[in-house]
A protein has these predicted regions:
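N-terminal flexible segment immediately upstream of the FAD-binding catalytic core
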Residues: 1-107, 125-157, 309-314, 378-403, ...
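C-terminal substrate-recognition/cap domain of FAD-linked oxidoreductases
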Residues: 60-81, 284-476, 484
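Short, well-ordered beta-strand elements within core beta-sheets of diverse protein domains
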Residues: 91-97, 271-278, 344-346, 404-408
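FAD-binding subdomain of flavoenzyme oxidoreductases
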Residues: 147-303
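Activity-critical C-terminal alpha-helical subdomain
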Residues: 494-538
Length: 538
């Protein structure tokens, strides 16, 4: 069973602890912190009000089920659950096992004027699945039982999955046939294929496999207006692409029940290589040139100087002698205090990997890059899904961590990255609080790159103070993203936390078009209101 107030499963052995070295580092970076009292599951269950739903055979109104579906995985969600300050719950939870049952639930919702929230893996970090304050009954539809591969067409390289299939099961089922989807967001262990489509997600190796919009070939969506079936067509010039209406729709138009995806044969080999460069500017240049020269890598990730140093020392724990030795060795090769760390991946046949790996190394060397020989790339691959597990031990020690992400054209990358990070770093200066912020580029394109900033700060004297600090930090970062013409989200989606910034990206007419499309499928605003677009009670 999933943890009710954090990341992972209750029986997981992947929980993390803060060692003394990391505690000392955090104290030096943002100051000493103190733990806050944590609410229990029983504490929160006691706050669940009586349901407003009438009885239905497919709907569970048990208070614990309602608590477990009340929040996602954003920092505000974490603060709500750990403080016990949860003020909205779904009135009931349904777990359909078929498209027919989803259809039945939507007919019931339409007839009884229910608010409907689709729920995949519950991994949203921007408030996608949180109920808004409403007088209407709220029904959360958990797709977790529609979680298997329904069909595979190896000749066309297509597979059909129930929308509630989580990442590991997607890969497990495809592997039996010698295939992979290759979609590995950091939430991969818990997030679902339907959620990936609904939030327009991006996997860590999207440079090779493509983002979810490249992998999504078609599927079925149940709406209040009927069933929308999207056929799998390799290419078409027959008007607008209907798939685009569903990609990133965040449950506003309907519930995705089946997803048809484009699959790839399992690669013979995969390698991850770390290279150090003398400066951020050099690293950005190399990342841009590698992609624009079409070097066939599967991933390029570039950490700025602060992230490079932070990751090396955080990973070292109490014994940092290995990092000190690495820095000494790099210094002797011209890589000093401004160093940055690039991790690139190669995926494919053995011959392809050998050729591309060497080509990339040669290009890096031409810019003063020094290749790591100690296996840091393998370490990254081994721990690629571990970061979310760190939030609980950080929180238990009185610290908070969160992220902001965007994407901009290459010409804007250096300035945007610097200003977003600096705005976050200084957002709590009026309180005399330090914020440790650092940045990486994780998805690169010929036109530009994503920018992903992580920040750590002290929760303070109470969970409410921690929430107030988060609001200031979020606002500071988001305003810089808008000021630099970036997307308000490259991979997390809009949800509730980003909705106020969407109009800067889409424009007045664009927002009106999206709103009209939502109203076509959902004229009374019952489907996940308050997400993607501003909330309006119909």
């Amino acid at each position: 069973m999933r943890l009710w107030n954090g990341w992972g499963n209750e029986n997981s052995n992947l929980s993390m602890e803060l060692n003394n070295g990391l505690r000392m580092l955090l104290t030096a970076l943002v100051g000493p912190a103190k733990p806050l009292p944590q609410a229990t599951l029983d504490d929160v269950i006691a706050k669940v009000p009586a349901t407003k739903l009438t009885a239905h055979s497919l709907i569970n109104t048990d208070p614990e089920a309602r608590v477990r579906h009340a929040r996602g995985q954003s920092l505000p969600d974490w603060l709500d659950m750990h403080s016990g300050n949860v003020d909205t719950f779904p009135d009931g939870v349904a777990m359909p096992e078929s498209s027919e049952e989803v259809r039945e639930l939507l007919v019931h919702a339409k007839a009884n004027d229910l608010v409907v929230i689709p729920y995949g893996g519950g991994t949203s970090v921007v408030g996608h699945i949180n109920p808004e304050q409403s007088d209407k009954p709220v029904l959360t539809i958990d797709m977790g039982k529609m979680n298997s591969m329904l069909h595979i067409d190896t000749e066309s390289q297509l597979a059909t999955f129930g929308a509630g299939t989580p990442g590991p099961k997607v890969e497990e089922e495809l592997k039996k046939h010698g295939y992979t989807l290759g979609h590995f967001p950091q939430s991969w262990e818990l997030s679902t294929v339907g959620g990936w489509v609904a939030s327009r997600s991006s996997g860590q190796q999207s440079l090779h496999y493509g983002r979810i919009e490249n992998l999504f070939a078609g599927g079925s969506i149940e709406t209040l207006a009927g069933t929308l079936d999207i056929p799998t067509i390799p290419a078409s010039s027959a008007g607008p692409d209907v798939r685009e209406m569903i990609l990133g729709s965040e449950g506003r138009m309907g519930i995705i029940t089946e997803v048809k995806v484009r699959i790839t044969p399992l690669p013979e080999q995969e390698q991850f290589q770390v290279v150090f460069f003398p400066s951020w500017d050099v690293g950005i240049t190399v990342a841009r040139e590698l992609i624009q020269q079409r070097v066939a890598l599967s991933m390029v990730r570039l950490s700025n100087p602060l992230e490079t140093t932070s990751l090396l020392y955080m990973g070292a724990g109490e014994d940092s002698s290995g990092v000190v030795a690495l820095e000494q060795s790099l210094s002797e090769k011209g890589i000093g205090s401004g160093k940055v760390m690039m991790t690139f991946g190669v995926t494919g046949s053995v011959r392809h990997c050998e050729t591309v790996h060497q080509l990339a190394l040669d290009h890096c060397a031409n810019h003063g890059g020094v290749a790591d020989q100690s296996g840091l790339g393998d370490n990254w691959a081994h721990g690629r899904f571990r970061a979310p597990y760190l939030r609980d031990p950080l929180g238990a020690a009185g610290y908070a961590a969160d992220t902001m992400e965007t994407a901009v054209d290459w010409a804007k990358v250096p300035t945007a990255a610097e200003n977003i990070e600096q705005a976050i770093r200084t957002a709590l200066a009026d309180e005399g609080e330090q914020v440790h912020a650092y940045t990486h580029l994780s998805h690169v394109y010929g036109q530009g790159s994503s920018i992903y900033t992580t920040y750590l700060f002290r929760l303070g004297e109470s969970y409410q103070q921690g929430m107030d600090r988060w609001v200031k930090l979020k606002k500071a970062g988001a305003e810089q993203i808008v000021a630099h013409g970036g997307t308000i989200s490259h991979q997390h989606g809009v949800g509730r936390d980003h909705r106020q910034y969407l109009s800067a990206e889409k424009g007045t007419l664009g927002i009106a078009a999206i709103n009209n499309l939502c109203e076509l499928f959902d004229p009374k605003g019952q489907m996940n209101p308050g997400k993607l677009l501003p909330y309006s009670e119909h």
